[in-house]
């Protein structure tokens, strides 16, 4: 072989090596990035060529796909968008996915390994591939009642969240976040309309894309007194334990004072029982109770209820609830009434109520009842799982009695005839100027008190006037409407 031919052969070999190296880099090392690149139309065309599975609740369709004549073969449809957006999320050409559309994507698009047999059968038979289905724990009647109550609970729409749980299992019966949005606007194949909708939602100061039920934490206010009371009871306090009834009290190690709602004393005498202080939600009494219980016991009890612990996915990701740092006696006093750095998601506060309702046992919350193949054959079912025992049955029973008494002195708008409810309200200051910022209104409850079927947490953000925007006035009627729907569903 002469020199020229050798040079040509070497050049060809070098080119082949370079081509193989480039193919290796592209197919092995860069494959994931290329697949995830939103500019990769082949991936999108492949995904939209398959009929994505359904998301359902109690037989009701929450999300499904319909055939189109366009370049992208299937279009995602959400028939009741606003009420269920926090559950389904969206599936979008330009903005990826959220909610169950994201968490259960492998099942919905058919790529889950448990659907391999179906994919193989489709390949040999020539059937069009289809995704699997997700059946949620949501009860449509409960979800709709909670959504409707939020839309009409504040002389118009409220901003906030409602979560309802089945105490004995941890099933999420309702998960509402308001204001909400229409996922159909982000699922459209009209990319210009999709981008316009995204920009409006992203820039909306009301944050409709935020799932307030699980992605945001809030000061719980007086609803946290349930945990403070649990810690005190476990440490030896009793419902008859006497506490101060003073209208205001100085916070130790500080120049600040803390007062009861409206600046009123808790009772006619110098002291008041824990039972009466709980029912009237007396701040000064609970500062004393928290200080006498101590930081370690309060934080340990909060952790037993699920705070300061990474929460399990439901399968959506949930923000961690926390007591925050309690660095001194003043911080302990404020934390004991659910202020300072204490912050909970509405889901976590619903779990607090559900744990008491379940004799002190905390159940792992979950949103997916079962996963099914395209032929509706079940591929997995969620089994209820105990997370921990938070309090003894005796402490849970005492807390139930205290919460029943508290419900009886709460404003009774929306009361359910013949149903005994155990509850605790809360009015939580927040923001950089809490004295001049409308407080959040809370309500946590379960019913029937002696045979609980449902536990709820209601949060109304920035409820209004400081003296009228209380948990009892705003949040409680929403909670009772949700409870009533759950009890009708179960009857």
From Swiss-Prot:
Q: Which InterPro entries match?
A: Bact_Transpept/Beta-Lactamase, Beta-lactam/transpept-like, PBPA_dimer, PCN-bd_Tpept
Source species, domain of life: Bacteria
Q: What is its EC number?
A: 3.4.16.4
- What are the recorded GO MF terms, alphabetically? penicillin binding; peptidoglycan L,D-transpeptidase activity; serine-type D-Ala-D-Ala carboxypeptidase activity
What residue ranges lie in the Periplasmic compartment? 30-491
| Residues spanning the membrane | 9-29
Pathway(s) the chain acts in: Cell wall biogenesis; peptidoglycan biosynthesis
Does Cell membrane appear among the keywords? Answer: yes
**According to the UniProt record, what class of enzyme is this?**
hydrolase
Q: Where is the active site?
A: 222
Give me the Cytoplasmic side stretches, as residue ranges: 1-8
Q: List the catalysed reactions.
A: Preferential cleavage: (Ac)2-L-Lys-D-Ala-|-D-Ala. Also transpeptidation of peptidyl-alanyl moieties that are N-acyl substituents of D-alanine
Predominant subcellular localization, coarse grouping? membrane
Task: Mention any Pfam family matching this sequence.
Answer: PBP_dimer_2
Keyword list (alphabetical) reads: Cell inner membrane, Cell membrane, Cell shape, Cell wall biogenesis/degradation, Hydrolase, Membrane, Peptidoglycan synthesis, Signal-anchor, Transmembrane, Transmembrane helix
Q: Known Gene3D superfamilies for this protein?
A: DD-peptidase/beta-lactamase superfamily (3.40.710.10), Penicillin-binding protein 2a (Domain 2) (3.90.1310.10)
UniProt family annotation: Belongs to the transpeptidase family.
What is this protein's function? Transpeptidase that catalyzes cross-linking of the peptidoglycan cell wall. Required for the regulation of cell length.
> What's the protein called, per UniProt?
Peptidoglycan D,D-transpeptidase PbpA
Upper taxonomic classification of the species?
Bacteria, Bacillati, Actinomycetota, Actinomycetes, Mycobacteriales
The gene name on file is pbpA
């Amino acid at each position: 072989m002469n020199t020229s031919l050798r040079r040509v052969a070497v050049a060809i070999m070098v080119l082949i090596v370079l081509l193989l190296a480039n193919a290796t880099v592209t197919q092995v090392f860069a494959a994931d990035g290329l697949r995830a690149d939103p500019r990769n139309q082949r991936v999108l065309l492949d995904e939209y060529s398959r009929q994505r599975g359904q998301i359902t609740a109690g037989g009701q369709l929450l999300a499904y796909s319909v055939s189109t004549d366009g370049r992208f073969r299937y279009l995602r449809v959400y028939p009741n968008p606003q009420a269920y957006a926090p559950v389904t999320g969206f599936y979008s050409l330009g903005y990826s996915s959220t909610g169950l559309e994201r968490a259960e994507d492998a099942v919905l698009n058919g790529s889950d390994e448990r659907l391999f047999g179906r994919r193989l059968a489709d390949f040999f038979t020539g059937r069009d591939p289809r995704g699997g289905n997700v059946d949620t724990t949501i009860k449509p009647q409960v979800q709709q009642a909670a959504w409707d109550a939020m839309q009409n609970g504040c002389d118009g729409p409220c901003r906030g969240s409602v979560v309802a749980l089945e105490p004995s299992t941890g099933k999420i019966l309702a998960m509402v976040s308001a204001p909400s949005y229409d996922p159909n606007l982000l699922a459209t194949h009209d990319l210009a309309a999709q981008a316009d909708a995204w920009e409006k939602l992203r820039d909306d100061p009301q944050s409709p894309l935020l799932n307030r039920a699980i992605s945001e934490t809030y000061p719980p206010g007086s609803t946290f007194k349930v945990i403070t009371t649990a810690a005190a009871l476990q440490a030896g306090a009793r419902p008859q334990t006497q506490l101060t009834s003073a209208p205001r009290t100085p916070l130790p190690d500080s120049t600040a004072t803390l007062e009861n709602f409206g600046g009123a004393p808790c009772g006619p005498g110098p002291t008041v029982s824990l039972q009466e202080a709980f029912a009237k939600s007396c701040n000064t009494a609970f500062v004393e109770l928290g200080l006498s219980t101590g930081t370690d016991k309060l934080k340990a009890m909060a952790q037993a209820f699920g705070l300061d612990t990474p929460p399990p996915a439901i399968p959506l990701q949930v923000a961690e609830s926390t007591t925050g740092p309690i660095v001194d006696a003043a911080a302990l006093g404020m934390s004991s009434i659910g202020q300072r750095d204490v912050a909970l998601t509405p889901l976590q506060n619903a779990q607090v109520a559900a744990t008491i309702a379940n004799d002190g046992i905390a159940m792992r919350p979950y949103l997916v009842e079962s996963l099914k193949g395209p032929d509706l054959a079940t591929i997995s079912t969620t089994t209820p799982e105990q997370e921990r025992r938070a309090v003894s049955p005796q402490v849970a029973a005492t807390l139930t009695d205290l919460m029943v008494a508290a419900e009886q002195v709460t404003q009774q708008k929306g009361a359910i005839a013949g149903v005994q409810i155990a509850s605790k309200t809360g009015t939580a200051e927040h923001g950089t100027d809490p004295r001049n910022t409308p407080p959040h209104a809370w309500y946590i409850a379960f019913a029937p008190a002696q045979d609980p079927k449902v536990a709820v947490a209601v949060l109304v953000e920035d409820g209004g006037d400081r003296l009228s925007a209380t948990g009892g006035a705003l949040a409680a009627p929403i909670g009772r409407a949700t409870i009533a729907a759950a009890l009708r569903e179960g009857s």
